[in-house]
Amino acid sequence: MRFFNTKKGLLTLGIIAGLGAALLAYLGNPKNMAFCIACFIRDTSGSMKFHNAEVVQYFRPEIVGIILGAFLISLFTKEYRSTGGSSPVIRFFLGVIMMVCALVFLGCPLRMILRMSAGDISSYVGFVGFAAGVATGSFFLRKGFSLGRAYPVKKENGYVLPIVVAVLFALVIAVPSLYVFSKKGPGSMHAVWYAALGVGLVFGVIAQKSRMCFAGSLRDIILLKDFRLFSVIGGIFIVMLIYNIATENFKFVAFGPIAHAQTIWNILSMYAVGFCAVLLGGCPLRQLVLAGTGSSDSVITVLGMFVGAAFAHNFKLAAGAAAVENAAKGIKAAAGGPGINGQIFVIISIIALFIVAFYGVKREKNK
């Protein structure tokens, strides 16, 4: 098991995770969206009728798989720890911010890497903002930022989320009429449920054992000069790059499928996501994994992300995808990007993150 704590071991786990993502892409998940925590939570909230955007409504088994995979492996390896009490209200609203800003970019950090592997230039632009956000968060960590200590709680607290998502998914299979499903758009594109669930389970196991975190990998490089976590991300990128080249999906373009090329908003939205992820202690994927391994604080964050996903579409905060005119298919050119509501939300979010960061540093110094 020590092997998987080395750079080579983590790279191997990343390659396995990348193969899972490639399989989902091959089996029908949307282009450049084989795996996206933000998009899949958004789709799931839509399927449960929390928003009415008809093209993004599907109960994604991958989300269930990640939570259950992390939960089961943590029990098996005795790494399960039920904790809570670290600024839950602040974490909830940070979860909302992280989700809405990800949907302004049209993807979480995981999807950003998948888009980069397909040659989507707008994702590289987003990466610049994400890295800057992580650097800003790391600066405040150096200054002593903390949301407060988490305390041990009854272990049954950590069982609630895995049980709830398992029951909700069982109802999808047994009584699908309880949910709504997209008939067109990204929500209508998906791998068969048992493959999606299986890959999600494996992904959850790998993410828990490797501590996979897109913000954490950059944070460790900045603060510790430690590149080990980045090896996992590199493995995913390499596999998806090979897959995209092999399937002729790799193209250097201003924006790929379900993306936009509004540079300033790609940068600012991912800046907020990176900053927020460091303050929370993990990116959207990491929050799912921690929620599955007993962290009530991460459960609160995930609930915030779920609410944020519905909020983004109900209040027109999410960005629209850009489109190139195609008269033969009846497609009109569209610039895409966020409307004024989304733009205002991103700016307010960045201001709020600085307030939280300054407060977290000040509180620790006054102890």
Language-model features, listed with the residues they occupy:
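Membrane-interfacial helix-loop segments of redox and metal-homeostasis proteins
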Residues: 1-367
